[in-house]
Amino acid sequence: MAVYNYDVVVLGSGPAGEGAAMNAAKAGRKVAMVDSRRQVGGNCTHLGTIPSKALRHSVRQIMQFNTNPMFRAIGEPRWFSFPDVLKSAEKVISKQVASRTGYYARNRVDVFFGTGSFADEQTVEVVCPNGVVEKLVAKHIIIATGSRPYRPADIDFHHPRVYDSDTILSLSHTPRKLIVYGAGVIGCEYASIFSGLGVLVELVDNRGQLLSFLDSEISQALSYHFSNNNITVRHNEEYERVEGLDNGVVLHLKSGKKIKADALLWCNGRTGNTDRLGLENIGIKVNSRGQIEVDQAYRTSVPNIYGAGDVIGWPSLASAAHDQGRSAAGSIVDNGSWRFVDDVPTGIYTIPEISSIGKNEQELTQAKVPYEVGKAFFKSMARAQIAGEPQGMLKILFHRETLEILGVHCFGYQASEIVHIGQAIMNQPGEQNNLKYFVNTTFNYPTMAEAYRVAAYDGLNRLF
């Protein structure tokens, strides 16, 4: 058994692990990275964020070709299979792996492929694919092993018609009808993707409203758009059992209803990848979801061991995970890079997409904050008309008296890009966070960013 000594060992090469390893390496620390897959990138690159967003992009292109009258001069609408669309995602994954492999090499981060587990508080044993065991001894260890779909024990996920958000990427056919169980972010995104391919989608929601953490107007807009695009949403429903058939699946609900489809996609909950880490050897406990508790410095109950990303829970976003990993390493190297990551924009890649940051109307009303609303509807925006993307709106919530921006909510074309302008102004100190910035600043024309100016004028016109 070979023994290696490091300043920092990072478990997991997803966004959190990458952020941690790069920050520690650039601070001059000797760093090792351990990943159970034989390629870097983690679930984000191989099973989650990257493939699903690449799929979404391809599906949007197909939808534009099939619905834009201009393209009828080229040919009639075309049908594309899910495996065909998946090929574009596979190319993106390969490019991402190559890029990230280069990052680790340039920054002298040693990468070990294999299953890592704790022997003690400073030792990680890595069982490599060839059976060889490597021992890594480190002053500090960062757990960034991510999460995986939660699988109830009473559902047979080995059945060829039952999938979760990881295994759906191995789907070898295009179902005519698909049940998506769980209407969280992942469920809504995949419902959009399959609907765009012409699949009839039954979206089963445990709650009474889609994505209830969103501003209610944005949530309602998504529901309306789903209803117009072959997605049937069933609220306040829970599964009783899943019956696998030779040619499909039947979902039995506790309400007594039954839904039959060609396949079932389970998108209800995730659990932290902690069960194979040997945490019992170092006294770290996990919650019912397999997640690790950390403090604001991202330190666990063991002083030299840190956690970041999905494995610690909220907000379980790739963007936040990278910053959490970087901050965890910042707590170790003390280079001024630590911050508690809480100003996180939400990006939901449905079709159309959604993004928001700050408070929503429900929260401001409950807190009795005197706010006003400014809106810009994309159907009136020149850039949206040019792009053929008239659906959606930008909504700014601001304080009636100080004009401080309290929240930005966007539904539609380029929403996840547009939100960052509002985020930048919201993060300005004191009076610099002001709605008037948008009416006193010249925007390129025509752009989607111009929606901020339109929404600001709309909001100011409401004041008296």
From Swiss-Prot:
GO terms for molecular function: dihydrolipoyl dehydrogenase (NADH) activity; flavin adenine dinucleotide binding; NAD(P)+ transhydrogenase (Si-specific) activity. InterPro entries: Class-I_Pyr_Nuc-Dis_Oxidored (IPR050151), FAD/NAD-bd_sf (IPR036188), FAD/NAD-binding_dom (IPR023753), FAD/NAD-linked_Rdtase_dimer_sf (IPR016156), Pyr_nuc-diS_OxRdtase (IPR001100), Pyr_nucl-diS_OxRdtase_dimer (IPR004099), STH_gammaproteobact (IPR022962). Keywords: Cytoplasm, FAD, Flavoprotein, NAD, NADP, Oxidoreductase. It catalyses: NAD(+) + NADPH = NADH + NADP(+). Its cofactor is FAD. Its main location: cytoplasm. Its EC number is 1.6.1.1. It is found in: Cytoplasm. Binds 1 FAD per subunit. GO terms for biological process: 2-oxoglutarate metabolic process; NADP metabolic process. One of its GO terms (cellular component) is cytosol. It holds the Pfam family Pyr_redox_2. FAD binds at residues 35-44. Belongs to the class-I pyridine nucleotide-disulfide oxidoreductase family. NCBIfam families: PRK05249.1 (NF003585). Conversion of NADPH, generated by peripheral catabolic pathways, to NADH, which can enter the respiratory chain for energy generation. This is Soluble pyridine nucleotide transhydrogenase.
